[in-house]
Design a protein with these regions (language model features):
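Non-transmembrane, amphipathic alpha-helical segments
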Residues: 46-61, 78-85, 106, 113, ...
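N-terminal signal peptide c-region/cleavage motif recognized by signal peptidases
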Residues: 16-19
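Short, solvent-exposed, charged loop/turn and helix-capping segments
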Residues: 96-114
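Immediate post-signal-peptide N-terminus of mature secreted/exported proteins
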Residues: 22-81, 160
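Bacterial N-terminal signal peptides that target proteins for export
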Residues: 1-10
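Helix-rich interaction surfaces within compact, conserved domain-sized segments
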Residues: 103, 114-162
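Charged, amphipathic alpha-helical oligomerization/scaffolding segments
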Residues: 57-60, 64, 88, 92-95, ...
Length: 162
């Protein structure tokens, strides 16, 4: 997969993840299969009425995204979350997404559906870092996490509690 599909170059994405204090951002890896979903109008869907299969790497990555966001929900709702905190959280989430992308070994049909969802995650992170209503970015990520749980097989998946 090419990260330019998400509207940013490698340098921009890696710079965005540089705010991670605990972990350095991994270098994005190229998928063996490349899809462009950002402007395709692709819609997230089920696999003939069933959830898409996942692998341990994707499940761990999505749990990490959720675990980055969950502890901050109270402060976000209370409107005490600062612009700097939004930017740092967005950077950590982007770092988790880069890890998901670099470890992706899903079959092409599952991968295509994942990419539809990843666009929403990256859009949410971008909104969290921009001037304006940063909470809209959080809402987009929460909705993407909910959509993940509804469309991808992940035993014991827990959505964000809010």
């Amino acid at each position: 997969m090419n990260i330019r599909s998400f509207g940013m170059g490698a340098a921009g994405l890696l710079a965005a993840t540089a705010v991670q204090a605990a972990e350095p951002a991994p270098a994005p890896a190229k998928h063996d299969h490349d899809h462009a979903h950002e402007a395709s109008g692709a819609t997230l869907r089920l696999n003939d009425g069933k959830k898409w299969q996942t692998d341990a790497s994707l499940r761990a990555g999505m749990e990490a995204v959720r675990d980055e966001l969950q502890p901050n929900v109270k402060a976000i709702h209370a409107k005490t979350f600062t612009a700097e905190q939004y930017a740092a959280l967005a950077g950590r989430i982007e770092g988790r997404l880069v890890t998901i992308m670099s470890a992706c070994k899903l079959p092409p049909d599952v991968d295509a559906q994942l990419h539809v969802l990843l666009v929403d995650f990256f859009d949410g992170a971008k909104t969290m870092k921009a001037d304006g209503d940063r909470m809209k970015g959080v809402v987009k990520i929460v909705r993407a996490l909910d959509a993940y749980g509804k469309h991808f097989e992940h035993p014991n998946w827990k959505s964000i509690e809010h």
